[in-house]
Amino acid sequence: MFVRSALFLSAALMLGGCDVKTELGKPCTLVRKATAEEQETQGRKFVEIHEKDIAADQDFISFGSLDCEDLVCVRDDQSPRSENPEAFAQGYCSKECVQGTTTGCTITRTVDDVEEGLKDRMTCRPLLLDQDTLDAIKVADEGFYRRTFGENNSPYFCAGATPTSQGT
C-alpha cells in the first residue's frame, strides 16, 4: 500500500511541476557559415557577425548559433545595436513557428536577460522569403537551399513584431 501511495504522490508532483522553460528570447550572438579559408584558419564552421555587417533597420536571422537550443538567433529591426561597428552582433534565440497560431512564441524565461519589451512584441511572423519562393529554390537546387537555410522549411519564426510587420 505504501509503495502505491508513494508512486502516486511522485507522479502527481512530477506532472504538477512540469513548467517548461525554453531559451526563446535568450540573448545570442549572430553567426554565419565560415568560408573555406576561415574554416581552415580558425577551425570553426561558423563565425560571428559584426555590427558593421548588418544594415540598420533590418531583420536578420542566423542559423547555427550554439547559444540557442534550436540554433536560431534573430535580431529584428527594433533590437538594440552596439555603437561599436566591430562588436559581435547580438540577437535573441528564436524557433520555427506555425503561421496564424497565437501560441508557441511565448517567452517563458524567468531570468532577467530578455531584451526589454520583447515579451510583449513576440509573435510568429515571416523572416525569410515567402513559402513559394523557398519551395522553388529547394526544387531548383536542393544543395544550395540546404547550405543557405539548413533544415528549415518555413519562413515563419518567433520574432519581435515591428511597426512594418504589424501593418502600421
What residue ranges belong to the model's regions?
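Bacterial N-terminal signal peptides that target proteins for export
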Residues: 1-7
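Extracellular glycan-targeting catalytic surfaces
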Residues: 12
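C-terminal motif of bacterial Sec signal peptides marking the signal peptidase cleavage site
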Residues: 15-17
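Secreted, cysteine-rich disulfide-bonded mini-domains of extracellular proteins
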Residues: 19-168
